[in-house]
A protein has these predicted regions:
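ADP-ribose/adenylate-binding Rossmann-like module
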Residues: 1-14, 148-172
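Glycine/serine-rich phosphate-binding loop and adjoining beta1-alpha1 elements at the start
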Residues: 1-78
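Generic secondary-structure signature for well-ordered alpha-helical cores
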Residues: 5-9, 43-51, 93, 97-101, ...
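Short, acidic Gly/Pro/Ser/Thr-rich loop/turn segments
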Residues: 18, 89-90, 157
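A short secondary-structure junction signal
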Residues: 22, 91-95, 161-162
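Short low-complexity, flexible loop/linker segments enriched in glycine and/or proline
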Residues: 25-29, 118-121, 166
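Predominant activation on well-ordered alpha-helical scaffold segments within soluble catalytic domains
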Residues: 38-42, 93, 97, 140, ...
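Glycine-rich phosphate/diphosphate-binding loop of Rossmann-like nucleotide-binding domains
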Residues: 53-145
Length: 172
């Protein structure tokens, strides 16, 4: 309401595209979206397990300090699945590594037991399967042994859903 009242113009930079007809985006979620989103996700995980939550990013406002804070946390045997191969996922991976969470292949993620925190980053080839409109998402096949799912892949409202809320209880 305040935006309308003050006649503020809002621009969704994510949707500014070239005029060639190809639809290339000029801007997209970048590295810092992945960094901050992952920090906030890990902080929520800490809070959910009744530990003292970390300072919020806007309160710290210093990347070196953020890295220092997250590196002191112990995430035990947490398993994180991450999608995407762009700037946001690279930022997310950067933050997970600062949190001392080890990256493993999807094969190792699914088939091995670890005594430390791990994550796997899967590409579209590994989580999208079919073109005929049927059950195209393979993500739900990976979530049965996943504590946190971080979606960093490009998304469009026309894309099929990776899983539905009704599936969440199946993953427990």
């Amino acid at each position: 309401r305040e935006v309308i009242k003050k006649k503020i113009t809002l621009i969704d930079y994510e949707n500014i595209r070239d005029v060639s007809g190809e639809g290339y985006r000029y801007l997209g979620f970048g590295r810092f979206a992945g960094i901050i989103g992952t920090y906030n996700t890990l902080n929520l995980y800490i809070k959910l397990y009744n530990k003292q939550p970390l300072s919020r990013v806007f309160e710290i406002n210093n990347y070196e300090q953020i890295k220092k804070i997250i590196s002191k946390q112990n995430f035990n045997k947490i398993k994180i699945l991450l999608t995407g191969s762009g700037r946001a996922s690279k930022g997310a991976i950067e933050m997970l590594k600062h949190a001392n969470i080890k990256q493993v292949s999807i094969n190792d993620y699914l088939n091995n037991k670890y005594s430390e925190a791990i994550f796997s980053n899967i590409s579209a080839k590994e989580h999208i399967e079919r073109k005929d409109g049927k059950d195209i998402s393979k993500v739900k096949n990976y979530l049965f042994d996943t504590d946190i799912f971080i979606a960093c892949h490009y998304w469009d409202p026309k894309f099929p859903k990776l899983f539905f809320p009704k599936h969440i209880n199946e993953f427990k």
